[in-house]
Amino acid sequence: MNKQQVIEKVEKAWADFHQAYNGLAPEQMIEPGVDGVWSVRDLLAHVSWWEDELLIHLPEILQGIRPKRYSVLYGGIDAFNALMTEKWAVLTLAEVQRKVMETHAKVITYLQSVPEEEFKSGSRFRRRILLDTYGHYPFHAKSIRDWREKTS
């Protein structure tokens, strides 16, 4: 895939993710149990903090810096997610929704600014994009769709 195709793939997966919760009332968005104890609001926050991580680590990767492992920094991905869940718990649904949209816009703007040659297949740069965007969103979209089907 070239740069434009990668961005289109990110945006398609993003739209599908948002479609999964489209039409939910605010009280449904904060109801726990969608994915473990997490609500849709929590899943939105989760996706957004991983996009924040993407914005931190993609520039490092392009500079040849290997980001430290989450196991070293936090004791693992689950520990990082728990820490971020606690950090984001103080935000209202509206604040989370605003942050989600702002962060995603920054991701797209950043990707558009990166030269085409950095999007080569198999690179650490491309793998990080996959892990934090179009490989990540569908997993949580499915959780939301499954929950909606189960609770309807």
How should each PLM-predicted stretch be described?
Residues 7, 11, 44, 48, ...:
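Short amphipathic alpha-helical segments with heptad-repeat character
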Residues 1-9, 63-69, 90-98, 124-128:
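Solvent-exposed interaction patches of small proteins and small membrane subunits
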Residues 30-79, 116-152:
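Short, contiguous alpha-helical
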Residues 1-28, 49, 53-60, 135:
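Alpha-helical bundle segments that constitute or directly flank the non-heme di-iron/ferroxidase center
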Residues 9, 76-118:
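Acidic/histidine-rich alpha-helical segments that form the ligand environment
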Residues 6-7, 20-21, 96, 140, ...:
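Short leucine-rich amphipathic alpha-helices used at interfaces
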Residues 17-20, 24-27, 110, 114-117, ...:
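A short secondary-structure junction motif
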